[in-house]
């Protein structure tokens, strides 16, 4: 945990990145500087959605599993006849935080380490859904949200996957440092080896990150640009940590550590979050630029169609 905290303290928030212009158009292909959103992710990216509901599932991941769950959630939402709750979804390497749009009241806070799957549903293509382990009883829950457009659902999915990747980097650095500290013991030997331990941790992390950047199942080719971020985690440790008031402090308790390790065993690749998007999905559709994700405007016809699922 100490290593994770020190990593967090080394991160200086970058509001200038969050305000960066990505171009005037709203519907653009995934930008070449997609990896720049990592800095924005540290502060949290906001999405304005409508909450459809939740249902329990038996497995932590799977396209067919999530599709069945979403179908059940949508049917229940339709049958209720109630107006969907407008929510703000905040995505960061910490996890997903859900707020009520009207009252700004906190609805739910889900650690990224408890999330096992997310997707843009193919049948209900405006729906984003994720599966996470409950904090109360460790059951698996599928939560679904109605987005303004299909591109929005895809954008949220990609953002959660990217947030997971950044969180995994912190988690692995923390684990590596803890293991090496335990092996080296205390005293002069431990002190003299701390610098080399940190260096080897970074080297090991860079090697795994280079090989597994946002695998997105068979979507690797669509995200080759992410290989440019191999050195990002090393850069984090070079940052000046003097501005304590602006730094993010990370904490990972034993319960979360255990949950993350357990869910990792169920993944196609333990180091990446399984998502229900393929390279064809991304290449056949234009993606929203990051600055436009929460600003998509609808024409009257689209607004009427929004509640038709």
UniProtKB/Swiss-Prot annotation:
Keyword Lipid metabolism on entry: yes
Tissue: Expressed at high level during oogenesis and embryogenesis. Found in the oocyte vegetal cortex. Found at low level in the adult liver and spleen. Found at very low level in testis and heart.
Residue span, PID domain: 41-195
Domain of life where this protein originates: Eukaryota
Residue segments, region AP-2 complex binding: 250-277
Motif [DE]-X(1,2)-F-X-X-[FL]-X-X-X-R motif per UniProt: ranges: 258-267
GO terms under biological process: cholesterol metabolic process; endocytosis
Location within or outside the cell: Cytoplasm
Motif segment (Clathrin box): 213-217
Region ranges (Disordered): 179-199
Keyword hit for Lyase: no
Any one Gene Ontology cellular component term annotated for this protein: early endosome
Major localization class: cytoplasm
Keywords per UniProt: Atherosclerosis, Cholesterol metabolism, Cytoplasm, Endocytosis, Hyperlipidemia, Lipid metabolism, Steroid metabolism, Sterol metabolism
InterPro entries: Adapter_Engulfment-Domain (IPR051133), PH-like_dom_sf (IPR011993), PTB/PI_dom (IPR006020)
PROSITE patterns on file: PID
Comment block on domains: The [DE]-X(1,2)-F-X-X-[FL]-X-X-X-R motif mediates interaction the AP-2 complex subunit AP2B1.
Function, as annotated: Adapter protein (clathrin-associated sorting protein (CLASP)) required for efficient endocytosis of the LDL receptor (LDLR). Also involved in the vitellogenin receptor mediated endocytosis of nutrients during oogenesis.
Subunit annotation: Interacts (via PID domain) with ldlr (via NPXY motif). Binds to soluble clathrin trimers and to the adapter protein complex 2 (AP-2, beta 2 subunit). Binds to phosphoinositides, which regulate clathrin bud assembly at the cell surface. Interacts with the VLDL receptor (vldlr). Interacts with the vitellogenin receptor.
PANTHER family linked: LOW DENSITY LIPOPROTEIN RECEPTOR ADAPTER PROTEIN 1, PHOSPHOTYROSINE INTERACTION DOMAIN-CONTAINING FAMILY MEMBER
Protein name, as recorded: Low density lipoprotein receptor adapter protein 1-A
Organism listed in the record: Xenopus laevis (African clawed frog)
The gene coding this protein: ldlrap1-a
